[in-house]
Amino acid sequence: MIFSTLEHILTHISFSIISVVITIQLMNLLVHELVQLGDASEKGMIATFFSITGLLVTRWIYSGHFPLSDLYESLIFLSWSFSIIHMVPYFRNHRNHFSAITAPSAIFTQGFATSGLLTEMHQSIILVPALQSQWLMMHVSMMLLSYAALLCGSLLSVALLVITFRKNSDIFDKRNNFLIRSFFFGEIEYLNEKRSVLQNTSFDSFTNYHKYQLTQRLDFWSYRVISLGFIFLTIGILSGAVWANEAWGSYWNWDPKEIWAFITWAIFAIYLHTRTNHSLQGANSAIVASIGFLIIWICYFGVNLLGIGLHSYGSFTLISN
């Protein structure tokens, strides 16, 4: 009872804090950027991380197993993964380049997890025999970390496509400066140092230069984050194959979840391959990553919504039955 109450409190604390963080970011975007509010939002994400960590640890203690056994627990862990990705660049150089993506992603996943749709999953149950394995932590955690990284990288690619195909005059107005502030990494300072070079350039050339710099940074960080997610995904698939052999007697069973995991892996393998070809970098590779964004959600939610296959643990169908 105590652990259940503590979990309930931590859930509401983390959701409330991240809601405040989103509000602060919207204020900076729509009204005016304030350094104090920006620092407060970063500290809020740190507090959210510790709240979700406490939530996972609490559920781990009273359930007796690592909290990755159903859709509710996996969504909480996915939200926790987004908060990690949010904090890593901040602690490295006190700048956050992913705040426009990670904070909304975290509140979306946690909001869905705590919604009424998954109420019956909030109570921990005894694991079925197939899930009572040391591979549970390894396989599922790697898959969810890969989903978080690949989703963030894919959203960066989506942003790249939006900027690439919009008119230059719309890119650098007041309404879009939030994304610019997130990814310019000192390009403004560089331009000030090189002001003499740009004195005779037209406004179109100036905005085109900024657009080029922004898309290059988006492409660069999308590649780095997706590469990390691809490594996690590969480890997750391989560890899952070993676990499947122990549980079901075969490394690969062509289960719907396995098929979509392979499709996801193939899509991002194609993305990484296109990045090795200089002529295909930028918008071309971003299109592949954007397709991958949709594939990830199909892979993650598809089986849980349909409740079919060997990976249907914690699905909506299973719970309703």
From Swiss-Prot:
Keywords: Chloroplast, Cytochrome c-type biogenesis, Membrane, Plastid, Thylakoid, Transmembrane, Transmembrane helix. GO terms for molecular function: heme binding. This is Cytochrome c biogenesis protein CcsA. It is found in: Plastid, Chloroplast thylakoid membrane. The chain crosses the membrane at residues 9-29, 44-64, 71-91, 98-118, 143-163, 225-245, 252-272, 286-306. May interact with Ccs1. Required during biogenesis of c-type cytochromes (cytochrome c6 and cytochrome f) at the step of heme attachment. The gene is ccsA. Belongs to the CcmF/CycK/Ccl1/NrfE/CcsA family. One of its GO terms (biological process) is cytochrome complex assembly. GO terms for cellular component: chloroplast thylakoid membrane; plasma membrane. It holds the Pfam family Cytochrom_C_asm. It comes from Acorus calamus var. americanus. It is a multi-pass membrane protein.
